[in-house]
A protein has these predicted regions:
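Short, glycine-/small- and polar/acidic-enriched structural segments
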Residues: 6-11, 25, 29-164, 169-172, ...
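Extracytoplasmic/secreted envelope proteins and their assembly/folding machinery
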Residues: 49-52, 80, 95, 120, ...
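Pocket-lining segment of extracytoplasmic ligand-binding domains
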Residues: 170-171, 176-264
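Short, solvent-exposed loop/beta-turn-alpha elements that line the ligand-binding surface or hinge
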Residues: 63, 213-216, 283-290
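Hydrophobic membrane-insertion alpha-helices, especially the h-region
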Residues: 12-24
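Ligand-binding clefts/hinges and TM-proximal coupling segments of bilobed small-molecule sensing domains
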Residues: 22-25, 146-167, 242-275, 313-316
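Secondary-structure end/capping motifs
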Residues: 231-308
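Conserved C-terminal helix/tail region of periplasmic/extracytoplasmic solute-binding proteins
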Residues: 302-331
Length: 331
C-alpha cells in the first residue's frame, strides 16, 4: 500500500511540476510579447497616408512583428516636429517639409516615398472675381502658405505660364485660413492642397476656376526618421516597409474598400476621398526623381530668400538600406 501511494504521489508531483512549468512558460511568453518595443509613427490626417491606416486596420504591422502606434497630426510639418522632438520614431511628410527641415538640421533621414500626386495642389479663384487665366492675377492678392508646397506650386505655375515677374501680392496665411479667405473674397485666389479644393467646391455658392497647371509640381509623401533611432532599430524599418508594401498592394486591389476605411478613420465623407483619389499613385520608391525634386525646391527656396544657407547634400538624407533590403527579400 505504501509503495502504491509513493508511486502515485511521485506521479502527482511530476504532473504538478509540469503544469506549473507550462503556466510559467506561458506567462513568460505573454510578458515577452507585451515587451515588444512600441514603434510610434506620426501620421498626417490625409488620404495620402492611406498605407498606414490600411496596415493598421488589417493587422499588417503585427504580421511583421511590429507593435505600431499611429499618432495623428494635422500636417506633415507637425508630424516632422513630433519626430524631431523624439515624441515619435517615424513621421510622414512631404518632400517640401524634408527640404526645409534639412536646411535647419542634419538629423533627418528619408527611408522611402509611399505616394505621389501631380494634381494635389491647385490655384483656385471664384468666377465673380473674373479671373480665369493666370495673367489676370496681375495686381491681385493670392493666399499662400509661406515656405511650403503651396508657395512653391504658385511660383511654379507663374514660371510655367512664362509670368515669373507678374506683379502679384502674396498673402501669407495658415492652412485653416485659406478657404475662408477665398470664400470671403479677402483674397482673389489661393494656392492650396487637397482637401481644400474639395472644400471650396463644396462650400462656394459661385463656380470655381482652377488656374493651375497639372503636372507642374510632383508632390510626394515620405517616411522619415532620425539617425539616433535608426542606429539601434535593427531590421525594424525594413519590416515597416514590408508592411506598407502589403498595404499598398491591398489598396490597389480594393480601392472602394480603402476609401470607405479612410472615410471612417478621417471622419470625412467618402465623396471627399473620391474627389482626388485617381490623382494618387501609391508605391514605395526612393530614386532620382525624388532627389531632383528636393534639389529643385532647395534652389527655389534660396532664390526666394526663404533660406540663407547653401543647399544640403540630399543624397546624405536618403537612408536606402531598409528599402533595398525590402526589395531583396521580395525578389
Amino acid at each position: 500500500m505504501q509503495v502504491w501511494l509513493k508511486k502515485h504521489w511521485a506521479s502527482g508531483m511530476v504532473i504538478l511540476v509540469l503544469t506549473v512549468s507550462a503556466l510559467l512558460f506561458y506567462q513568460h511568453k505573454i510578458r515577452t510579447e507585451d515587451l515588444v518595443d512600441e514603434t510610434k509613427i506620426g501620421v498626417s490626417l490625409t488620404p495620402l497616408s492611406a498605407p498606414f491606416f490600411v496596415a493598421d486596420q488589417m493587422g499588417l504591422f503585427k504580421q511583421y512583428g511590429l507593435n505600431v502606434s499611429l499618432l495623428p497630426c494635422s500636417s506633415g510639418v507637425s508630424c516632422a516636429d513630433l519626430m524631431l522632438s523624439s515624441d515619435v520614431d517615424y513621421a510622414t511628410a512631404s518632400e517640401s517639409v524634408v527640404m526645409f527641415k534639412s536646411f535647419q538640421r542634419d538629423d533627418i533621414l528619408l527611408l522611402a516615398s509611399f505616394v505621389e500626386s501631380d494634381n494635389d495642389l491647385k490655384l483656385l479663384s471664384l468666377v465673380p472675381s473674373k479671373i480665369s487665366r493666370v495673367a489676370q492675377l496681375e495686381g491681385k492678392r493670392v493666399g499662400v502658405i509661406k515656405g511650403s508646397a503651396s508657395e512653391f506650386y504658385f511660383d511654379s505655375v507663374l514660371i510655367g505660364s512664362n509670368l515669373r515677374d507678374l506683379r502679384v501680392e502674396k498673402v501669407y496665411l495658415q492652412p485653416k485660413e485659406l478657404v475662408p479667405a477665398l470664400l470671403a473674397y479677402n483674397v482673389d485666389a489661393i494656392s492650396a492642397w487637397e482637401p481644400m479644393g474639395f472644400q471650396v467646391d463644396l462650400l462656394s455658392v459661385a463656380r470655381v476656376h482652377n488656374l493651375g497647371i497639372e503636372g507642374v509640381y510632383q508632390l510626394s509623401f515620405n517616411l522619415i526618421s532620425r539617425p539616433s533611432h535608426l542606429e539601434f532599430a535593427g531590421d525594424e524599418p525594413t519590416r515597416l516597409l514590408q508592411a506598407l508594401q502589403d498595404a499598398i498592394d491591398w489598396i490597389k486591389a480594393h480601392p472602394d474598400q480603402t476609401m470607405t476605411l479612410l472615410s471612417q478613420r478621417l471622419e470625412v465623407p467618402v465623396e471627399q476621398i473620391d474627389w482626388s483619389w485617381d490623382d494618387y499613385v501609391f508605391r514605395l520608391s526612393l530614386g532620382n526623381s525624388l532627389l531632383s525634386n528636393l534639389q529643385l525646391q532647395a534652389r527655389w527656396a534660396i532664390d526666394s530668400g526663404l533660406v540663407s544657407k547653401s543647399p544640403p547634400d540630399f543624397r546624405r538624407v536618403f537612408y536606402s538600406h531598409p528599402y533595398q533590403q525590402m526589395l531583396a527579400e521580395r525578389n
